[in-house]
Amino acid sequence: MPDPSSTRPAAVPAALPADLPAAPSGPASAAETALHYPLGDSLPQVGCSLEVAPGLRWVRMALPFALDHINLWLLRDRLDGREGWTVVDCGIDDEATRAAWEQVFSHELQGLPVLRVLVTHMHPDHIGLAHWITERWSTADQACRLWISSTDWHAAQMASQGIGGAGGDMAADFFRLHGLVDAAVLAQVRQRRGHYAGMVPQVPARYRRLMDGLDVAIGGTGWRCLAGYGHAPEHISLHSPAQGVLISGDMVLPRVSTNVSVYPMEPEADVLTLFLNSLERLRTLPAGTLVLPSHGRPFRGLQTRIDQLQAHHEARLAEARDACAARPSTAADLLPVLFRRTLDLHQTTFAMGEAVAHVHALWTQGRVTPEDGRDGVRRWRATTPA
């Protein structure tokens, strides 16, 4: 949803990554009204589910962030001769989410077990409880296995051990390079080394690999894995041609733009270009596809939403480039250009990653060039005058 304080055209959603807070509830924006929501304002209550297609149910769990919920999915399944359910995404590991899942297990599964857990990507709200659900539903004879891309399984293992990510010494040094020089803020970033592990204390030791182009049969229906890049290392969306449904994960969201960040372990990455290229692949799906996003309501209008997201990023790229033409700018200098609202520490870490992503895309395009100063800070200069 656009930032209410933004002066940007309503047709271009404001730059709110999925991990940053959505603006307060209010009238739908022009961008949002261009989409069709077949379920209207219907939402599943916590611990309950809502059918969105035959054999496919919607579960909604709370998150302790300003973006206060995640959508999870139950798919009726038959696996290795056993009747049950496949769960897509899990929520973070906390007592409230476990309690909500227990309600789902008791009242929404028709007395059947969870057979496997598919995770779209390694972010905490998606993989956090994968270890608990798979352990809870595994038996001596049959494992309830985690299915995930290999890249994201390895990334989750590292992050749960405090390696990489948006906190700790490496992150603080990376943010300082890009102009975040406030000592108090950097000290707080250094203390966030265990932030991911607090929501994902454990990742299943074994998994089954999802990869681009793989067809997974769930309940007799084929689901094609579509890899996407830029938001996570190897995000997997699931498309059912027969049902006309796309479980988009975080790749396409109806109200906010997906967070696309550069992280310190891959400091020169051009993740925004990867993300935009991934959206182009999703554009080729049928126009009437029902999109089941991880945040927000199920919607139709996939191509329209992709157009909006691309226009949004093109506008932000132009603004970032103009700022660098006016004077050499750090990524931190660009925060008030790209995010016209007050950011707390949690939001600032994601916003810094996204600001770097935008200047790196401009760098790839030859529109800016880096200049490392004697102060140890990197500034970006436009290659041509404004």
Per-segment meaning from a language model:
Residues 52-60, 192-199, 219-221:
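Short Pro/Gly-enriched beta-strand edge/turn motifs at strand-loop
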Residues 82-95, 196-207, 215-217, 222-317:
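Metallo-beta-lactamase
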Residues 96-98, 102-216, 244, 300:
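Active-site HxH/HxHxD metal-binding segment of metal-dependent hydrolases
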Residues 2-38, 318-386:
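C-terminal regulatory/interaction regions
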Residues 120-126, 149, 229-231, 235, ...:
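Histidine-centered divalent metal-coordination motifs
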Residues 65-67, 208-210, 229-232, 386:
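A short catalytic or substrate-binding loop motif that flags glycine-/basic-rich loops and adjacent residues
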Residues 46-110, 237-254:
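Conserved beta-strand hairpin/beta-sheet module of binuclear metal-dependent hydrolase folds
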